[in-house]
Amino acid sequence: MKIVGISDMHGIYEGFTIPKADILCICGDIVPLKYQNYIKSSDEWFINEFIPWCCKQPIEQVYLVGGNHDIFLMNRKYVIDQYLMGTKINYLDNSSCEYSDDTGKVYTIFGSPDCHKFGSWAFMYEPKTELEH
């Protein structure tokens, strides 16, 4: 199985060649920086540019996880899943999907956008102290 992983595209993907693979993992910060604080603009870019770009890549399945600049993805899994319905793109937000290779072997792909708080970004959380675990 061949897996390609990319991140921190910030909307710059034209001219970027993705090699043929089984899985593409896009690990956050997809939205252009100029849209990061605007849900409607981010949604329009996602629907009209990002989804078509992903769908034309030589990849069987795409797994997308949000990043700290992807504010438009926060708390919107249902909406994002509606946009992606019928495509080969799976949005993972503390969730998983199964992927079956051509031999029938099944893999579980898990994705989480969460990261320790370090500013006013998306998907931040306060880490618990060791005593709180």
Q: At which residue positions do the language-model features occur?
A:
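Binuclear metal-dependent hydrolase catalytic cores centered on His/Asp/Glu-rich metal-binding motifs
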Residues: K105-H133
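Beta-strand-turn-beta hairpins that frame and shape the catalytic cleft
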Residues: M1-V4, S96-G111
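Core catalytic region of metal-dependent phosphoesterases/phosphodiesterases
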Residues: I6, G11-D101
